[in-house]
């Protein structure tokens, strides 16, 4: 093509077998491995590494310090029958996120829409993030996990392998989803779910401790769990008891707001 990609504020290391479009933008210290493809309009933040045979296409913005491993495919059109070729949409990925081998991330199905992944996430090999998903900061997706369209995942949630998640489902902050689960409904923050279909089994105590949630707040969350799931109430009755008997606290407030906003119901 005779042109070289635009490099912002410093040199990039591009393997001679890689194909980088002249209208891609590479930050300082970016490394692009053998046979990788970086398409038109892709923007890579400082220090990001792209492994061999990875394919990055379309309106794709990758933050600084990310690592994209071999065979990952990011920014391709959504697997949506309503999709029309040429619809302007994209993918945004935050800083210091790790994307392992053969992960697939599709761009939004909506005009000027975005599929969004936050900072410091870890997407393990072969996991999939579909169009229009919103993934928070510090989220871990383990291998063979699939997020379908419009799924939302809260900060520091952990989703174990071979989990299938229905379109439009929301997974709350610091939730833990056990392996081989099926999620047809929303998962409230802080809880541990497992099964096909998934059921709440308890509180994600290990995750709460690792996140530095104070002991008093963990006890409040455990009380909320018992009111919601172990007191024989309907979800609405349990939620009302949580509202009136617990808090106010940032953790209980977030739990109540999440459940109250659910359109699909909660597991």
Regions found by a protein language model. Name each.
Residues 1-17, 22-23, 28-29, 65, ...:
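Terminal amphipathic alpha-helical/low-complexity segments used for targeting or macromolecular assembly
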């Amino acid at each position: 093509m005779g042109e070289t990609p635009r490099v912002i504020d410093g040199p990039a290391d591009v393997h001679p077998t890689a194909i980088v479009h002249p209208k891609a933008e590479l930050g300082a210290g970016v490394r692009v491995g053998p046979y990788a493809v970086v398409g038109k309009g892709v923007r890579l933040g400082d220090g990001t590494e792209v492994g061999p045979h990875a394919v990055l296409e379309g309106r794709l913005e990758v933050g600084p310090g990310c690592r994209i491993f071999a065979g990952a495919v990011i920014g391709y059109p959504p697997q949506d029958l309503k999709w029309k070729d040429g619809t302007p949409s994209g993918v945004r990925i935050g800083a210091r996120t790790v994307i392992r081998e053969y992960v697939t991330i599709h761009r939004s199905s909506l005009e000027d829409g975005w599929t969004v992944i936050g900072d410091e996430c870890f997407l393990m090999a072969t996991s999939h993030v579909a169009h229009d998903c919103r993934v928070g900061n510090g989220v871990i997706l383990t291998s063979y996990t699939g997020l379908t369209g419009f799924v939302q995942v809260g900060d520091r949630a952990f989703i174990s392998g071979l989990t299938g998640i229905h379109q439009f489902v929301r997974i709350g902050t610091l939730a833990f989803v056990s392996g081989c689960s099926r999620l047809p409904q929303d998962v409230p923050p802080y809880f541990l779910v497992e099964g096909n279909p998934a059921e709440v089994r308890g509180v994600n105590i290990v995750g709460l401790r690792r996140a530095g949630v104070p002991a008093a707040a963990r006890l409040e969350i455990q009380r909320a769990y018992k009111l919601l799931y172990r007191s024989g109430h309907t979800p609405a009755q349990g939620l009302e008891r949580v509202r009136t008997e617990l808090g106010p606290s940032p953790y209980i407030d977030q739990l109540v707001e999440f459940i109250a906003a659910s359109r699909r119901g909660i597991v």
